[in-house]
Structure formats: C-alpha cells, structure tokens
Amino acid sequence: MFSTATSPYDDLVIKATDENLASEDWALNMDVCDKVSSDGQNGARQAVTALQKRLSHRNPNVQIYALELANSLAQNCGKDLLGELSSRNWTSALDRLINDRATSTPVKKKALSFVKSWAKQIEETGDPNLGLMGELYDQLRAKNHVFDEPEPTPESAEEARRRQEEEELQRVLELSKQDKGGRSLFTYQPSGSAGASSSSAANNNTSPSIPQSQAQPLAQDQAQSQAAPQVTGYAPQPQKIYSPQPLEPEPPRVDLNTATCVRAIYPFTGQEVGELDFERGDVIKVLDRGFKEWWRGACNGKIGIFPVTYVEALPEPTPKELQEKAQEEARVFASLGLVDQLLQTLKGIDPARGDKLDDHPEIEEMYQASVALQGQINTLIKKYSDQKAELEHMNANFIRAMGQYEELRNGPPLVQAQPFGYVPPQPQPLLQQQNSYSYQQYPQQPQQQPQPYAQAPYAQQAQPQLQPEQYAQQTPSPAAQSQASYTAQQQPYPAQVQQDPAAASPPPNQPFYHHGGSTTSVNRIPSAQTAVQPQPHGAPSFPPSSPPTRQVTEPGVAGLGAGDQQAWDQYYQQHGQQAPHSSQHPSQPQSQPQSQPQSQPQSQQGSYYPAHAQAQGYQAAYATVPDGRAYASPPLPGTQQGQGVEGVTAGMDRMSVHAP
C-alpha cells in the first residue's frame, strides 16, 4: 500500500543542498532542472517532494539552498513545476517555515521574497487551478509580514557613471531655477534712441556678469537719468545658466598585465591536470605570468593555470577598503565567543527534565546572531585557504631555489680516488646458489671423475651415481657378485659436467682426507656416524657414503673381502669352484671382465685429494684383483705389480693409511 522505495531525486537534491557547501552549486541545480524537464510531470512531483523534505531541515544553509533550487526549477521547468509549487503540501511547508520562530531571519526573508515572486509568476499564467500560492501570499500579507523585494543586481561602472551624471544635471537645474540673478527689475524698451538702445543692450549683455547686490543700484540710476517715458511691459524670464561642476575623476583603468587580482567573467572547467577551475565572478589572485595566454593563480584554495581571456583586472583596494575589511574580520573573530556561549547554554537544556527552548528567549537571540556570522565565516575560510595555497606554493619554490643554490655553491660531489688495481667486489648470487645446491641437492649434480690413466675397459664407462636413500640403505656386498645383481642396483647417470682437475685440490691450510682406491677394508672412509666434513670450494658434490665398519683381521690376510668368509663361500658355490687356502686369493673368472666390487664407487672419491694421492689410490685400486693378475692397464713406471696380499701390502706401504 505504501511504497518505501526512495525517489531518484533524493540523492540529487541532497547533494545540491548539502550543508557543507559554501554557496549555491549552480551546476548541480541545472542538472536537476534538466532531469525534471526530461521526466515531465512525474519528475516535477518527485523533485518538489524531495525539496519539501529539505525545508524541514534545521540547518539554515540547507533551507536557503532548497529555496534557491526551487526558484531555479520554477524559472526553467515550465507549467508542470509551477503546478507542483501551488500544491497544498508545498504551500503548507512554506507557511510553517515562515511562521516558525526558530527559522532564521535570512531564511524567512528569502522565503517571503520567493512567495511573492512565485505568486506573481503563477498569476501571469491565467490558470485558475493554481491559486493556492496567491492565497498564501494574501494570508502572509494580512499578518503584516514584510515582503522585501529581491536584491538588485550590481550595476556596472558605465551605468553608475551615467546615473551620476544625470543626478548632477538635475541638481544644477534646481539651483538655476532658484537663482534669478536680479533680472526681474529690468524693463523691456521696444523703441528708443540708438544711444538708449545701445546702452540698454549693453546693460542687458553685462547684467548676467554683475552680482545681484550691484545690479539693483545700477538699474535705479539708469531709470532716474532717462527723461523719456518708459513703457512697462514683458519682463523676460531669467535664462538658464549652466555651469557644470567638475565631476569626480574617473578611476584609472587597471592594466591586466600589472593587476594582482583578477575576476572571472566566464566559468572555466579545466580539461588537463594543473588547470584551475572557477565560476563566473570568482576572484583569482595572480601568482605567476610565465606565459602570455596562461597565468598561474590561486582560487578557492587551489593553485593552477587559467586562461587570461577569461578574466578581467580588478583595481587595487584602497586603504579605506582594507581598513573596513580588517574591522569586519575583527568583529567575526570577536563573535566566536558568542558561538561558544550558545553551545554551553544548549548543553544545559535537558528535554527529559521538561526544558523547552521557548522558555529561554536568549537562546533564540544568540542563535540568530550566530547564523548571521555564517556568511562572513565562509568568506574568511575562502580567503585563508587561498593564502595557505599561496604560501605552500612559495615554500615549494623556496626549497627548489635553496637546493639549486647549494648545488652551485658547493659544486658537484668529488669522486673518491681508489687505489691502483682496485676492483670492487661483485656479488655472485648465482654462484652462491649453486654452492648451496651442491650441499643439499647432490643427486642432481653429476660430476665427471678425472681419469689419470688410459684404461681400456673403463675409459668410456660412466661411474654410477646413487641416490641418497640408496646410500643410506645399501649394505656392503662382497666383491664377487654377478654382473646382473650389480647393475640392477645402479641408476642411469645423467650427463656429466667436465671440471678442471685443479679445482678439485683443496685450499691451503685446510684439513682433508685422502684414501687410496683400495679393494681392501684397510683404507675405509670414516663411518657415516661421524660428522661429515664440509666440502671445499670447487670440489665435486659427491654424497656422503656409508661404508661398512672395518673388521679387525690379521696382518697379511687383509685381502679383498677379508673378514667376510661367508660371502666368499657363497661366491665359490655359484661358480662351482673350490675355495683355495687362506693365503691365496681365488682367481676371478674371465667371463666377467666388467664386474666391479661394490666398494668401487668409494674408491672414486680420490678426487677429493691431491694429485699424488690420486695416482697411488688408482694404482692400489686397479693393481690387484682376487686372482692376483693385473685388471687394468699396466702400472706406472717405477712401480711394482704385487700378487695377492703381497701386492696389496706393497701398495699400502706407498700411501697414507688412516684408521676409521
């Protein structure tokens, strides 16, 4: 039954009558007028309903802006809007507003003036159905309300000068009518002697320049000296003597190129960043004339450039005007205590106790006086906002000038001389990242082991790279396992990166371990339970190995797989051979030349150690096999090829042995 939907005009009217506006926003008012004109009678009804809500607002600014918007609609939206202004709801709202004691005086005066103008405008339409506004006007006039005429528009300088000239002319005419100059005593002589006529003409010609006190005796003497009878007749009216008095000097025209303040004669809306927006009549303070067509100025608290053709020059204020403005400003600041007193008085009124504003007439007086200050306060706010923007602009220019002065005074900064051959350190994030990966992601970092000897069967064979979980779970196996079981535990080795063998040498004064590549359990790498030594810079990133624990054996019997008799027995059972005596090593079948012991990857870690240790390690690793024959290429010159345990012990004498 009752619609709760909000009108589309509510937001527009609220925005156009905002209480925080310093003055009427004519652009928004015109937008509302355009919308009402396009919507017709329905739009007019909704707009007047929204304005009626704003009239009930207690803020005087909102009420004044609502009345101004209603007047704009009445002047631009035609008969549909005038019919809504003559409705019972709108006229009742105006009647309550005018007769309310709490309504401020400026609002009441503006409402009365608009009621009179609207009643006259509606009467001119000749529609008898629009008579409510006229009835309201008659009722208010019967109550002795004063209907002030709208304030006249300020006249231009040309009109003021013309009006002043006319007033001066009328004043001179009135003075000339009052001053006859004694010419009423002169008589007219139609005929007479030439001398008489000439003397009479002379007297008539000279009479205007003779004062009145001297003209009367002179006329009497002439009348007595004449013997001929004089005929009295027509006495001429005194002629109008116009002696124009000098007018007040016209104020000199102000040059636009020297004026400090200009006034906008057209509205301007900036299209680019930095352009200053203003309305017609705004006063702009000129700050800079850097360009011919565009100047920089301050207006409404903003600084920007504006076109010169949109403004006119304003004369400089006189000392009297400056004094009046200073006195008015002082009165405004002196009245601020009145506003504080009003607030304190309003805080002491409690409606819960039954207090009413009607019981305190002093509150109404203070309120009306405070409302009268609002326009002056808005003017001062605009004035000081412009000064603030100007000071900020001046401060920015000063800081820029100070920086340039210091730069020119001190000169450019001197470059500090560096010693000869100095190269600043360069950050190597990629190298550090690769080093961090070499400690953590070693399975993905394949390395190429340098081969000190040219070995026929192993020259093209890639060394296996096991995953970390395989290193942790793999158990030592005997040297004599089948090729299938050995290759099943290996994984494909990715493409290897060739490295410089010199990079494998550790830095000086750093501890390192070097173990010869041996198939025995003598030169075992320390157990995985001990702390892993950090790899030196440039070393291959092999994962830590977990070799079996070294078992104590008798000297001379520390051959391949010594101490693991069960594994050797299993090996001989698979190949159908008889186990030899403990002093001899079994010969490895020729059908498996490619098989290697499980400890072979451990022997490849010789790249951690110096070059001479690598040579000894590879010699010890490939010099002997269980059958005592050479398994790889011949040894280096100057070395002997041992057989069995003797060969192993001979190799052990030439390298350092570290206990685990």
Swiss-Prot record:
GO CC term (a single one): ESCRT-0 complex
Domain SH3: 257-316
Entry keyword annotation includes Protein transport: yes
Signal peptide range: none
UniProt domain UIM: residue ranges: 164-183
Keywords: Endosome, Membrane, Protein transport, SH3 domain, Transport
Biased composition (Low complexity): 190-230, 437-503, 573-623, 638-651
Biased segments, Polar residues type: 517-533
Topology class, membrane: Peripheral membrane protein
GO MF, one example: ubiquitin binding
Annotated compartments: Endosome membrane
Domain VHS: 16-148
A Pfam family of this chain: VHS
Residue ranges of the region described as Disordered: 146-254, 437-660
Recorded superkingdom: Eukaryota
SUPFAM superfamilies assigned: ENTH/VHS domain, SH3-domain
Bias type Basic and acidic residues, positions: 158-182
GO terms, biological process: protein transport to vacuole involved in ubiquitin-dependent protein catabolic process via the multivesicular body sorting pathway
Family: Belongs to the STAM family.
Function: Component of the ESCRT-0 complex which is the sorting receptor for ubiquitinated cargo proteins at the multivesicular body (MVB).
Assembly, per entry: Component of the ESCRT-0 complex composed of HSE1 and VPS27.
Name assigned to this protein: Class E vacuolar protein-sorting machinery protein HSE1
UniProt source species: Cryptococcus neoformans var. neoformans serotype D (strain B-3501A) (Filobasidiella neoformans)
